[in-house]
Structures are given as structure tokens and as C-alpha cells.
Amino acid sequence: MIRFFSYFFLILILSLKVIALEVTLTQGTVKPTPIAVTDLFSENSNFEKIGKNISNVISDNLERSGLFIPLDEKAFIQSNKSLSQQPRFEDWKVIKAQHLVAGKIFGSNGKISVEFRLYDVFQQKQLVGKKYETSEKNWRRVAHIISDSVFKNITGEGGYFDTRIVYVAETGPKDNKQKRLAIMDQDQANHRFLTDGSYLVLTPRFSPNSQKITYMSYVNRNSPRVYIFDIETGKQEIVGEFPGMTFAPRFSPDGNKIVMSFTDPDIGNSEIYILDLKTRISKRITDNSAIDVSASFSPDGKKIVFNSDRSGRRHLYISDVDGKNVKRISREAGSYYTPVWSPRGDMIAFTKQEGGQFYI
């Protein structure tokens, strides 16, 4: 059985008014790398289709990243039918391929074994070779794992292809919309709903191992509360015993804590709390008359970034995980929301509202 390791960042913009969404993409500055992805060969015709499907998913993944251009298989001079011998690198140089992905597939009784090799065509050497064994129904996941390996060995950065997306799906007539918690693979495959739409769900976030989801929900149709949903069991549980509204949750990097905001009905403003999921003990991180919300842990778990109106407008702040050493990091005009740290910790993504427009 293949184990699941996936990471995901989701930025969700919520507004009370539905407006047309316009997304402007600027041109990239990196020239995509030509790469040849051959069909996985098999001595058993029953697995040829699966092998081709795996290769197609790998090609699609790499192309969508914007860093690779998979070459047309019609241009291939050599047809790889063995992994025991080195490819004829000159044949791949002729068609301008800088890297080559080749592999084979075999199996029986509902099980498959997939081997692949990644070659550097110009250096004429193998960069990586791996073998995966799993059930036949997991062939698509194997393709994503191979894609991640190819991506990492060429770029030096971890891939994102073996990941899932959690989001709020809105369906139904205009006057009776249903908002359901849903997940799918990063390439839109394997979509399914997790909740039935009988109650409102918002701001879902994955745990580090992607087996649990924390989100805000109106399960009781009263005050919104933070919940955790277990994907394997389908069970959900409320997070913490708070007398007021809890919202904007995120997991810590180790998955053992949740940072969220709490609005005390006796005070009215929102403060940030960290709840230990093992001990169920919560700790208040901010303490002032301002609204402090949308906290996110740094990758090492030592700091948090959040937005606050303590300066008069919504701006971004960083503090130690205990709330000390608060520092404002946004200075330009506009209001700032939903900050989240990059996996490397060198950047922070956020939503900005200025002049009636939203920007990411």
C-alpha cells in the first residue's frame, strides 16, 4: 500500500456579495525545459493501457507546472523497451530533449509494479531510478509520485503533484445554495463531497499529513465554531470549549496544535488562541482591544503571522508563537487578509483589498 504524504496551501477569499472573478496572469520569466516522457512498456498487453495512462498523467503534471515542455511522442526516434540498457542519448539530443523519463509496468492479481528512470540527456547519466508496488487501482497516485520525483531531481524543489485540494463547493439554486466540504486531487481527479450541505462550512485547511481538515461551521445554526473532520472515519468534532465564536483555524506544522481566533461575547473583539489537540489546553496569544485574526504558523512552528486592525486598518503582523516580539510587516495602502507562510518560510502569501479590488 502506498502511503500518503501531501501538503497544500489554500487561499480563500470570502465576500458577502457575489462578484465576477477576474484573474490576471503575468508572463513567466523561466523558459520551460524540454522533456521526453515515454510510455511505460509492458510484456503483458493487459498493462499497456495503464502504462500509457501513467505516462500521460506524468506529462500533464509536468506541463501544468510551467517548468517543462513534454515533447510530442511522434518525434521520438528511440522506443525504449528495456531499462537494463542505457538510452541512445544522441537520439534524444536530436529532438532537443534535455531529460528523459522511461519505465515499465508489470503485475498480477490486481497488483502492479512500476519502475521508472530519469535521465539527464546532455550529461548522459541516470539521475534517479525507483520502483513502486501497489494495487492496480492506485495507478494514478503512482503517476503523481513519479512526477514529484522527476520535479525534485531536476529543480531541487519538492513537487506538489501528489497532493489534494480541500475547498467549499457551492451548488444548488440561487435562492437555496448549499456549501459542502469537498476534496479532490490537484489535477481535479477523485473528487468527492465530505459533508451533505445541511450546514454551512467555511475556510477549510488540511492537517500536515492531509488526513484531517479543520474548518469553521454553523452546525447548530447558531454561533460558528471550529471543527476537525477526519477523512478516514468521516467523523467531525468541535475544537475547544469556548463560549463564543471561534473561526479562522490552521494546523501547526506538526499537526498537534491549532491556531484560531475567538470572539468573546462579553468583550466583542477577536483574539488569537493556540489549542493543544492532545491536552485540549488553550493559550491566548494576543491581548488588546483590536481585532486579531487569520493566524498562520511559520514552517518551523516558532512564529505566527496574522492580520490586525490595531493600527486603524487591517495590516499583517509577525510575532513569536507565544505572542511576544510583535512586528508589523505591511506598510503600503490597503487592507490585508488571510496571510500564510510558504513551505520554505521565505515568503508570505496574502489577500489585499484596495480601491474596491482584491489582489493576491
Give the residues covered by each predicted segment.
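A flexible loop/linker signature enriched in serine peptidases of the S9 family
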Residues: 158, 170-180, 197-199, 217-225, ...
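Amphipathic beta-strand/beta-sheet edge segments enriched in Tyr/Trp
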Residues: 22-25, 82-149
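Residue-level detector of Asp-centered blade-edge/turn motifs that repeat once per structural unit
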Residues: 159-161, 208-209, 253-254, 299-300, ...
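Short beta-strand->alpha-helix linker/helix-N-cap micro-motif
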Residues: 26-88, 101-105
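Hydrophobic beta-strand positions that form the internal "hydrophobic ladder"
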Residues: 165, 213-214, 255-258, 301-305, ...
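Short loop/turn segments that connect beta-strands within beta-propeller blades
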Residues: 122, 185-189, 230-234, 276-280, ...
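Bacterial N-terminal signal peptides
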Residues: 6-17
